[in-house]
From Swiss-Prot:
Residues 72-97 are annotated as: Disordered. It is a peripheral membrane protein. Could be involved in insertion of integral membrane proteins into the membrane. It comes from Alcanivorax borkumensis (strain ATCC 700651 / DSM 11573 / NCIMB 13689 / SK2). The keyword Transit peptide does not apply. This is Putative membrane protein insertion efficiency factor. One of its GO terms (cellular component) is plasma membrane. SMART domains: Haemolytic (SM01234).
Amino acid sequence: MKSLLLGAIWLYQKVLSPWIGNQCRFYPTCSEYARQAVETHGSLRGSALAAKRLCKCHPWHPGGFDYVPGAVPGAEPDQEQHQCTPLCNHHSEDHSQ
């Protein structure tokens, strides 16, 4: 099943995609994301990840970088490093003087 999916993705990338042009608002493109997802996570989970990505690829989504989880080492942010913290705490004081 995995090789069948990868073959379909390859066919799309080599035949259909050049003909219709690059319309994807993400990096990597949705077809490349699907290929990496199937390679990394197998047919079932890879297809689910690809379907989720395709649902986000529309004009109302800003797009940007969206890597397959676990496919690109170092591409996923360190959760502790990106914790939201308040810049200051003086906003809780009363400034109505």
